[in-house]
Amino acid sequence: MSAAPLDPRGHGDPDVDGILARASFADDGLLPAVIQQHDTREVLMLGYMDREALRRTLTTGRVTFWSRSRSEYWRKGDTSGHGQYVRDAALDCDGDTVLVQVDQVGVACHTGTRTCFDADHLHPVTGARPAADEGPTP
């Protein structure tokens, strides 16, 4: 992972200014943050971070988001007790999305489900990988 990892006891030493310089925030100043359970790799939720929320996430060991609807910082679990504790973080190849691996306490979704992706399965047509001898499809 490209970001310096934080150890579970909060002893990470990330180059936060360097990470913020590499991050590519959108015109609205936000960066999508994919939140994933560190041990199962289950995707829990998607939130948004501005520079300060990313800084707080990398330096405190707790995930901090920017609320687009309330225009304020928030941390999962501050009211519910269902906290997200940072285990690792990485920017994607373009620097325009951050993956934060967490130790999730309780449920991640405000609806009371484990993830925010439990309710609305879209049932897409599934694809199949071509056989090894077929090569790529033109």
UniProtKB/Swiss-Prot annotation:
Its main location: cytoplasm. Its cofactor is Mg(2+); Zn(2+). It is found in: Cytoplasm. Keywords: Amino-acid biosynthesis, Cytoplasm, Histidine biosynthesis, Hydrolase, Magnesium, Metal-binding, Zinc. One of its GO terms (cellular component) is cytoplasm. One of its GO terms (biological process) is L-histidine biosynthetic process. GO terms for molecular function: magnesium ion binding; phosphoribosyl-AMP cyclohydrolase activity; zinc ion binding. The keyword Transcription regulation does not apply. This is Phosphoribosyl-AMP cyclohydrolase. Its EC number is 3.5.4.19. Pathway: Amino-acid biosynthesis; L-histidine biosynthesis; L-histidine from 5-phospho-alpha-D-ribose 1-diphosphate: step 3/9. Belongs to the PRA-CH family. It catalyses: 1-(5-phospho-beta-D-ribosyl)-5'-AMP + H2O = 1-(5-phospho-beta-D-ribosyl)-5-[(5-phospho-beta-D-ribosylamino)methylideneamino]imidazole-4-carboxamide. Zn(2+) binds at residues 93, 109, 116.
